[in-house]
């Protein structure tokens, strides 16, 4: 254990005074807003005071400085006390706290990154610790810096499985630069938390997950100072026994006060009572950090060379992804890869082989994997690429949604999409993923159809802001592009055209190749079709689609290895809605599939070359 230097009585009293000022600010802000969670703030007041004004090292006027210690408020509903901390530190004006939750203020009801001191958005509970793990992993293994990471969790969110995924991850990777503080205030939103104040059980659970676990009185600044000063040979959990509404007579420890601001008259009485306990108005200055984090530049990362494929050769886009990522890894040591124990299927194992120190095995914990990536990406320290079966990203949709709210720049590659994976059956088939990722506000959705396009998608994703999703397929398909083909986000490609095309057919991945095969069948009948590769499903190349449709008598046929809802067909329909003389016909998977050979399943669900040819004939006959 490190030697513990007990703060003198003056410092301890100053920390107590700071905690009470944080309480007062939280109460004032929530009362002014008419909403918020003052009692949840009050249970954490001493924790926040000791953390920010005794333990943490940071530049108070530069919250995102790369050398600073990191803090994640996983119990995001306690945002007012986070804002109060930064006012106490001098970064925010005290008066700004009274604008909490106003549309004109950046002080949202829960933390968001438009605030310079917030790295990741929280409020959807159970996700903060995973992001903190990503920050700690980056600090220990990539930056090799001395900054530490602190995460404050509520006891209610400890029912979330994602918390324990993160606990396991931190232990496996020996994140001794990570401290989780559990604010055990006994009460959840509508009922007491399941373990209430059974502190020994919390301790045993943390220890079982490989953490150094310390029980403290969460309202004793001295005990907190001592706990934060303990040994750092493994991740540390400080299990703080606290009381919701601490310091408020008649409210402390009582149920039914969650998310309820105090009426003005009541707030004034409470504030007067708390204020009477403050002995000094003197503020504690933040301690600056050790400046040993390396300078990092992740802008404009480019492939070291063009693709090296040969037209006509066959490769699965999932394998092309692995090769492309490994190649991009040679362009920057800040390209990192994460996988959920599927690296031999997603082919991220190629990256691991070439860059073992930058590969993070997250095991079968997809929610945590996404949170880890978000943490790794904070402060522009890395460019993360996560991979697993596309179907399994659906489990992490809330984490992906919160990543968008966090303004995070992460890249997710989902393999094994659609019925074309074959015999493994419907549990492994991604048929909802396009709908899911299209709905995310900051997303770019790549759907490459050959090895060249896949390599370009990886390069573009590394340089595109927001959430990038790359959809890859299991079957091997022919290379259709030359290695020097230029690709851009939102730019589709015309793969096949003639002056007398009668229908525009839009497919991607496996179905693009089926469309090309259908074109060969139809050509024998003297029917020409135009074949489009959208490349990105979001954003969609509306202009090229409209131009092609107008050149083919207004007829568009979309074909996709995905359910009807939310996929390529609906994206195209939305793009052309209101345009006169244009009709869109959809071919897609229309029910829960089954096991079978890929060709059998494509035929069964009407998305193979024969179904496309038949649909084209039907459209022409209608005319």
Swiss-Prot record:
Glycyl lysine isopeptide (Lys-Gly) (interchain with G-Cter in SUMO2) crosslink residues: 352
Residues the record lists as N6-acetyllysine modifications: 6, 11, 144, 204, 232, 241, 260, 538, 603
GO biological process, one term: pentose-phosphate shunt, non-oxidative branch
Enzyme kind, highest EC tier: transferase
Binding positions (Mg(2+)): 155, 185, 187
GO function terms (MF aspect): metal ion binding; thiamine pyrophosphate binding; transketolase activity
The EC number(s) this enzyme carries: 2.2.1.1
GO cellular component term of the entry, any: endoplasmic reticulum membrane
Modification Phosphoserine, positions: 104, 295, 345
NCBIfam families: PRK05899.2-5
Reported function: Catalyzes the transfer of a two-carbon ketol group from a ketose donor to an aldose acceptor, via a covalent intermediate with the cofactor thiamine pyrophosphate.
Subunit structure: Homodimer.
Family that this chain belongs to: Belongs to the transketolase family.
Name the UniProt record assigns to this protein: Transketolase
Source species of the chain: Pan troglodytes (Chimpanzee)
The organism's taxonomic lineage, starting at the top: Eukaryota, Metazoa, Chordata, Craniata, Vertebrata
């Amino acid at each position: 254990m490190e030697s513990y230097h007990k703060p003198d009585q003056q410092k301890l009293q100053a920390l107590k005074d700071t905690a009470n000022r944080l309480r007062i600010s939280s109460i004032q802000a929530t009362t002014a807003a008419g909403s918020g969670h003052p009692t949840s703030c009050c249970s954490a007041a001493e924790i926040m005071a000791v953390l920010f004004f005794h333990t943490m090292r940071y530049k108070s006027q530069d919250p995102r400085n790369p050398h600073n210690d990191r803090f994640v408020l996983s119990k995001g509903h306690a945002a007012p006390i986070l804002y109060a901390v930064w006012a106490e530190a001098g970064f925010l004006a005290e008066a700004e706290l009274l604008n909490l939750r106003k549309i004109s203020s950046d002080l949202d009801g829960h933390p968001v990154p438009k605030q310079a001191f917030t790295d990741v958005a929280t409020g959807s509970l159970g996700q903060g610790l995973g992001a903190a793990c990503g920050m700690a992993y980056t600090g220990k293994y990539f930056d090799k810096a001395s900054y530490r990471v602190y995460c404050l969790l509520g006891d209610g969110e400890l029912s979330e499985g994602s918390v324990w995924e993160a606990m396991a991850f931190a232990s496996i990777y020996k994140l001794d630069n990570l401290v989780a503080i559990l604010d055990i205030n006994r009460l959840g939103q509508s009922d007491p938390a399941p373990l209430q104040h059974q502190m020994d059980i919390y301790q045993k659970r943390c220890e079982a997950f490989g953490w150094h676990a310390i029980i403290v009185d969460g309202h004793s600044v001295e005990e907190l100072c001592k706990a934060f000063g303990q040994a750092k040979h493994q991740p540390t959990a400080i299990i703080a026994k606290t009381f919701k509404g601490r310091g408020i007579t008649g409210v402390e420890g009582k149920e039914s006060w969650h998310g309820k601001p105090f009426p003005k008259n009541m707030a004034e009485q409470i504030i007067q009572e708390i204020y009477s306990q403050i002995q000094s108005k003197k503020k504690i200055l933040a301690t600056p950090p050790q400046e040993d984090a390396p300078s990092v530049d992740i802008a404009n990362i480019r492939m070291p060379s063009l693709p090296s494929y040969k037209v006509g050769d066959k490769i699965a886009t999932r394998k092309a992804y692995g090769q492309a990522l490994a190649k991009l890894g040679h362009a920057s040591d800040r390209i990192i890869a994460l996988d959920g124990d599927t690296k031999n299927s997603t082919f991220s194992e190629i990256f691991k082989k070439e860059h073992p120190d930058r590969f993070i095995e997250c095991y079968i914990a997809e929610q945590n994997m996404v949170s880890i990536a978000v943490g790794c990406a904070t402060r522009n320290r890395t460019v993360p690429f996560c991979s697993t079966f596309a179907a399994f990203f659906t489990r992490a949709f809330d984490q992906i949604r919160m990543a968008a709210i966090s303004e995070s720049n992460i890249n997710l590659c989902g393999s094994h999409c659609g019925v074309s994976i074959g015999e493994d059956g419907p549990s492994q088939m991604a048929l909802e993923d396009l709908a899911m990722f299209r709905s995310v506000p900051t997303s770019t959705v790549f759907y490459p159809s050959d090895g060249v396009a896949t390599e370009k998608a990886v390069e573009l994703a590394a340089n595109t802001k927001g959430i990038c999703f790359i959809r890859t397929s299991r079957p091997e398909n022919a290379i259709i592009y030359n290695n020097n083909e230029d690709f851009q986000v939102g730019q589709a490609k015309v793969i096949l055209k003639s002056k007398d095309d009668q229908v525009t057919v839009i497919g991607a991945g496996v179905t693009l190749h089926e469309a090309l095969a259908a074109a060969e069948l139809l050509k024998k009948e003297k029917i020409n079709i135009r074949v489009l590769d959208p490349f990105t499903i979001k954003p969609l190349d509306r202009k090229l689609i409209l131009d092609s449709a107008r050149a083919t008598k207004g007829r568009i046929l979309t074909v996709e290895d995905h359910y009807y809802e939310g996929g390529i067909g609906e994206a195209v329909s939305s793009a052309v809605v209101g345009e006169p003389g244009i009709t869109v016909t959809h071919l897609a998977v229309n029910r829960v599939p089954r096991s079978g050979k890929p060709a059998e399943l494509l035929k069964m669900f009407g998305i193979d070359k024969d179904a496309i040819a038949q649909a084209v004939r039907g459209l022409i006959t209608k005319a």
